[in-house]
Amino acid sequence: MEANRIEEKIYKYGADILASEGMQKEKTFVQHGSITCYDHSLRVAEKSLELAEKCSAYIDERSLVRGALLHDYFLYDWHEKDGGHRLHGFFHAERALHNARRDFNLNFIERDIIRKHMFPLNIIPPKFRESWIVTWADKLCAAEETTRVLRLAFTKTARG
């Protein structure tokens, strides 16, 4: 899918989310390396649409995009060393779901995407195709974002 069509779909289905106070707050939190939670969520939505296009089955693109944008809607800096976020990987999906339900009307698919995107770290598997797609898109984006940081650090170390 070409970049313009992906961007159009993200804004078609998620403009209210992107403009929300919570998503604006996500711009202040780092997710992986120098990537903000906001940018990570956008990347996951983009990657989800790319993966969905490869599926021969019907995909609810609206739920896919909205769930992807909100999958990390936990709204805190998990890098803070206060001890309160030590098990972030295990618990942030429920926090994200709580915040998303407070701020938006979510359908079953969107709720499942947010709650289960950390599978298999969280042991209950996704129920819907859309949830599986966002789960994989999140893993792919996180790996890319994290390895970019490691690659840069390794390059700087190697150069002395």
Language-model region placement:
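Metal-dependent phosphohydrolase cores
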Residues: 1-160
